[in-house]
Amino acid sequence: MGFKVVRAAGVDTDLELINDHLFESYVDLGDPISEAVDRAAARVRSIETDMEALMHSPYQGTLSPQITPGLRHVTKDKAIFYFEVDNVRQIVLILAVFFSGQDHEQRILERLGRT
């Protein structure tokens, strides 16, 4: 049996924020609103596909033991995924998804209550 990807509570909000950011960026760059909506939604779907693909190679990415033991992060097409792997339960727990030029290390520290 393979690993299962599980989203922590804040991940859906992360994806909504990314969607909003992308939508605003596309509109600012001149896209019509309907096209900006479609492009942002497609990009978020792509991020979700990349997130689900972590089930196939759960031990990829960089360990971040300075933040918390077992924490990993990996960047895929400008989306940064923070996650933990539970080998016993065969779960990849997605803790956060950040996008592009954000200070993602500071943001994960805040998310985990370490600041």
Residue ranges and their predicted role:
Residues V11, I47, F83:
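GIY-YIG nuclease signature motif recognition
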